[in-house]
Amino acid sequence: MSRIGKKPIEIPDSVDISINNNEVTVKGPKGELSQVVDQSIILEEEEGQLLVKRPTDSNHHKSLHGLSRSLIANMVEGVTNGFERHLEIVGVGYRAQMQGKNLVLNVGYSHPVTIEPPEGVEIEVPKNNQIIVKGTDKEVVGQVAARIRAVRKPEPYKGKGIKYAEEQIIRKVGKTGK
């Protein structure tokens, strides 16, 4: 039995889950998310919990079991609390600012880089070297944060670039002169 898949998903009172032809729709205070789950996965709702079950113990069903449970649990978490990723900008003259809903990054290129967030994702810039990406869908929040980081990845010598707040940059020693 999948250790992740066999855990029941706790459904808070503020969240409403509807299952229609293997499409799971989760509505909560922060919004609504829907996800299509594989046809072989069995979903049962009982006493404020959602149980995810699989028909057989084949490797294919085992992998889908844990995946489906995690996706639905992330949807429930997203519509109740939401997700956020924090990024930091390191480097002299590197900064971020908002122009309307768009994020404008000045990170050492000859031109500013503009990033337009997709629907359902909010970007905040509390300081000009900090970025916060917020949203209900964990996957989309992670993708937007990765796209921002990819504009100028941190380099290993001075650590300049855009990094996740919790990320540790492994530093290299520069070349030594004779």
Curated annotation (Swiss-Prot):
Keywords: Ribonucleoprotein, Ribosomal protein, RNA-binding, rRNA-binding. PROSITE patterns: RIBOSOMAL_L6_1. The keyword Membrane does not apply. GO terms for cellular component: cytosolic large ribosomal subunit. It comes from the Bacteria. InterPro entries: Ribosomal_uL6-like (IPR000702), Ribosomal_uL6-like_a/b-dom_sf (IPR036789), Ribosomal_uL6_a/b-dom (IPR020040), Ribosomal_uL6_bac-type (IPR019906), Ribosomal_uL6_CS (IPR002358). Part of the 50S ribosomal subunit. This protein binds to the 23S rRNA, and is important in its secondary structure. It is located near the subunit interface in the base of the L7/L12 stalk, and near the tRNA binding site of the peptidyltransferase center. Belongs to the universal ribosomal protein uL6 family. This is Large ribosomal subunit protein uL6.
